Amino acid sequence: MFKIKKIQTVKFLSKNAAILFVFIFLMSCSKDPVVTPVSVYCSIISEKLLAFSRLSNFEKQRFQELSDTRLQKYKNDFIEAAETFDLEWELLAAVAFQESQWNPKARSATQVKGMMMLTLPTAASVGVTDRLDPIQSIYGGAQYLSELRQIVEYGTSSGDKTAFVLAAYNLGMTNVKNAVEQINGNPSKVTWLELEEHLIQLKSSMDTESYSRGQQTVDFVERVRDYYYLLLSQKCSD
C-alpha cells in the first residue's frame, strides 16, 4: 500500500470540517501547519491555484455540471477505492473525468473503454473482467495508479512523482522509462519539466505535425491537475 502524497496539505478543523489546501502541482512545500481562517485558504484556492488552469470557462462550467450530476452517483466509490489504495479520491476522480467525463460506457477508437478507459491488458492485470462496469473500472484504475506509484522512481519532489505517475498512466510505463533514459544519465534526477519538454518534441509515424503523442501526454497531466484543483476548490462550498 502507498500514498500518492499531497504536494502540500494544510488542514484547518472546525467541528467536523476539514479544508484541504494544495499549492501547485509541481512544487513541494513546507509540511508545517499554518493557522489561518478557512476563508483565506478558500480565497487562495479560488484566486491563485485556479489561475494556473488552462481550462476555458466553458470547460470549467461543463466540469461543474457533471460534478453535480454524474460524479455524485459514483463519488462514494471513488472515495472507497482511493482509501483502499491510499490515494486521494480527488486525484482518482480527476483522472476519470479526463478519461471519460465520468461516463462508464465511454469508448475510444483505440479500444480503451469504461470509466477509467483501461486497455484490455491493463484491465486483466488488475482483475477487471468487465471494463464497462463502473465499480470494477474505478477500483481497477485505482489499483493501476497504485502499482505505477510503486514502480516510478523518477521525480525530485512528490509533485514531480505524481506527474510521472500520471504520464505513465496515459503513455505507458515503458514509454516513460525510455523517454527518461534519453534525458539524463541519472534517471532519479530527471524532473517533470525536463520530461515535459522532451515529450513535446517526440514524434512518431502516427503523430500529426501539430499534435504529437508526447504532447497528448503532457496535456493529460496538466488537465488532470486542473480537474484535481477544481475538485479541491469544491470543499470551500461544502
Predicted regions and their residues:
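N-terminal export signals and maturation junctions of secreted/periplasmic proteins
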Residues: 26-79, 105
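Catalytic and substrate-binding regions of cell-wall glycan-acting enzymes that process beta-1,4-linked
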Residues: 47-52, 163-230
